[in-house]
Amino acid sequence: EMTWNFACSTTETSTWADGGRKFGELMEKATGGKVKVNIYAADQLTNGNQSEGIQALMNGDPVQISMHSNLIYSAFDPRFNVVSLPFVYDSYDDADAKFDGEAGEKLKEILGEYGLHCMGIAENGFREITNSKHEIKSVDDMKNLKVRVAGSNLLMECYKRWGADATNMNWSETYTALQQNTVEGEENPLPAIDAASVQEVQPYCSMWDAIYDCLFFCINQDIYDG
């Protein structure tokens, strides 16, 4: 018998954590109870640090399986930023077609270079921007807005060029920062926004579909081979 730890950045109520739980149910059933999967949302095993959550997966301890965004993986390899170049996709169908095909296979190959087996590429979605100050109807409305962005140099550069006062922050720290007005806005796909109850402290949400990101559902290669 063995126990695997699944980690993700979002909360217990998120679709990411739901995916981990479903995987655990299927593994337990397929192995007759010999493999159990514990769920650690909000990167609990690495004190909320998303990059350290991925490093723990690469090490195979204390994380054996995880679901993290390509944007966080870009801290290890800038090639993962290609997924999130602005205004590349016409629709969700367009993005799905690319990652179900050659682009997805190439990304899996790169993950393999880091000792990871990618079991699937999931949809995180288009990253919408929320804020507590005003409606955003044009890029000019982002001028000097203090916006939390995910840990990606690409996102930092994009939002700075769009005029925002962009800052990086772990997702686990973001709700409190929004509540205390340390930052005035954040950007994320709607499921992550909803799971973290961002709408409680952010009255404005701009649906502009500028940047898309995906999720890599990975297992440590040594664990997979074992």
Explain the meaning of each model-derived region.
Residues 1-93, 109-226:
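N-terminal secretory/targeting leader peptides
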